[in-house]
Amino acid sequence: LLKHTEKESVDELIKADISELLKLGWTDPEYFKSKAADNKTDVYCAIFKPSHFDENKKYPILDYIYPGPQSLGLRDHSFGQDNGQVLSMVELGFVIVIIEGRGTSERSKSYHDYSYGQLEDNGSIEDHIQVIKNLSETRKYMNISKVGMYGHSGGGYSTANALLKY
């Protein structure tokens, strides 16, 4: 939609048509907020489900982590260039969660500084554990006994840290 600086609509340039995606079973991720491990701080999250999703089945969980520190892992993953891996994994039968734990950017300075000087806490693995436990209580399709984690760059570091620490 093209607009003047006064926000008056001028012309529609193009309109996205996702009808073919919807026919294939694609659904938008579920965005929500949950409490961090401190039980008071809100963290932002998303759940991605396979196109063949069946609420009566149990799905293994993959936690995609990218703690930054300069950017977020959770953006508009619906059609972003980085979401290919997320969409591929859900179609293999996983439920993917993305959790912006304390220490990630683009919130308050104190939120971002949570892991300052303590890189091992970047992205707060404790927040990821808390959110996944909370989710498994309300979303019975999530198999809490089968949880994996993966990420790139800082997310790879956080994944290795989680494997060694937990």
Describe each model-derived feature in a short phrase.
Residues 1-166:
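Serine-hydrolase catalytic core recognition
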